[in-house]
């Protein structure tokens, strides 16, 4: 027996705002919003598939009073699906991301960005559909 990765919970100051940002990044949509907690996921699986409903993993944003103070110990890597890395970085910066320095050197193939609340993530060079 094993476990499946189904959801990533993210503490934040503005669950709705951060959920909107990540929906734009990933092409996700809001699945549930209740009492300061917002869950987003991929669009529903079309009818006739084996498991109708959101395709995991989902992201759940929960309001917490304290802010982020240190570098993430866990982060997301995203892959552009229909454009080159530099084009995707420009798109994400336009959505509200910013460049982040986590000690990376100039000779790495990924770009480190932070979401509007400072959570670091990487944009990889490889395109994956």
What are these model-derived regions, one by one?
Residues 13-15, 76-117:
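Vicinal oxygen chelate
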Residues 22, 117-121:
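Short, glycine-anchored, charge-dense loop/turn motifs used at functional sites
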Residues 1-19, 74, 127-129:
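N-terminal beta-strand motif that seeds the catalytic metal site of vicinal oxygen chelate
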Residues 11-56, 94, 107:
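Core segments of cupin and vicinal oxygen chelate
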Residues 41-45, 113-116, 126:
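Active-site beta-strand termini and strand-to-loop segments that position acidic
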Residues 57-62, 112, 121-122:
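Conserved beta-strand in the GNAT
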Residues 107, 122, 126-129:
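Short, charged, intrinsically disordered terminal tails
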């Amino acid at each position: 027996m094993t476990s499946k990765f189904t959801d990533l919970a993210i503490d934040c100051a503005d669950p709705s705002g951060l959920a909107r940002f990540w929906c734009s990044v990933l092409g996700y949509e809001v699945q549930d919003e209740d009492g300061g907690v917002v869950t987003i996921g991929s669009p529903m699986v079309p009818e006739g598939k084996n498991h109708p409903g959101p395709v995991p993993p989902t992201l759940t944003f929960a309001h917490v009073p304290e802010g982020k103070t240190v570098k993430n110990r866990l982060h997301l890597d995203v892959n552009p699906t229909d454009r080159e890395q530099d084009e995707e970085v420009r798109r994400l910066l336009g959505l509200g991301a910013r460049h982040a320095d986590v000690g990376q050197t100039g000779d790495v193939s990924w770009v480190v960005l932070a979401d509007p609340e400072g959570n670091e993530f990487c944009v990889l060079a490889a395109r994956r559909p």
